[in-house]
């Protein structure tokens, strides 16, 4: 049965503070109003098949995440940025997102937590808005279930796509640890 007051009874969701790890940590593409230095992001979404690691953590895999985002002013993005957004499935307009979360802050309903779903350029710099928020999704999120106060980490070194899952391959002493991953994109 569920132990309601257990330290291990933990919820990780779209508002959880998450660390960005790996080669994209601190990269300009990860800078947002939430994390001006590009080392953190808010939340994880559409987590699919959880793989485990030999060291006792698990990997929650973000799949089909792009549809939650919308862009209030796509004409301000470079052609390369627009191509990248199309490739991943980020919507070119506001109001076309899966849940229309990207419209909530525009009408003044809820404010800051929902502003990040609008990847339009609305501030002077990337640290003033959420133009890069979509760049912080599409990764494997490592969670330590035995350290309830630990911060989940998005493992950017494992690549970015619509992760279906990540499972460790056969572990052999003296050899690199290998993970097998599946992509569950909907194009």
Report each predicted region and the residues it spans:
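Conserved small-residue
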Residues: 1-187
């Amino acid at each position: 049965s569920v132990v309601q007051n257990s330290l291990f009874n933990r919820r990780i969701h779209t508002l959880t503070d998450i660390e960005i790890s790996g080669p994209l940590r601190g990269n300009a593409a990860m800078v947002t109003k939430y994390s001006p230095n590009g080392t953190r992001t808010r939340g994880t979404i559409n987590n699919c098949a959880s793989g485990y690691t030999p060291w006792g953590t698990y990997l929650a895999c973000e799949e089909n995440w792009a549809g939650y985002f919308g862009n209030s002013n796509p004409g301000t993005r470079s052609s390369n940025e627009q191509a990248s957004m199309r490739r991943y499935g980020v919507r070119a307009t506001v109001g076309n997102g899966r849940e229309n979360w990207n419209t909530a802050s525009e009408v003044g309903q809820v404010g800051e937590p929902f502003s990040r779903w609008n990847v339009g350029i609305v501030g002077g710099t990337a640290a003033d808005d959420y133009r890069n928020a979509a760049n912080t999704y599409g990764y494997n999120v490592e969670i330590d279930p035995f350290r309830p106060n630990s911060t989940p980490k998005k493992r950017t070194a494992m690549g970015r796509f619509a992760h279906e899952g990540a499972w460790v391959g056969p572990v052999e002493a003296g050899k690199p640890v290998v993970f097998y991953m599946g992509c569950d994109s909907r194009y």
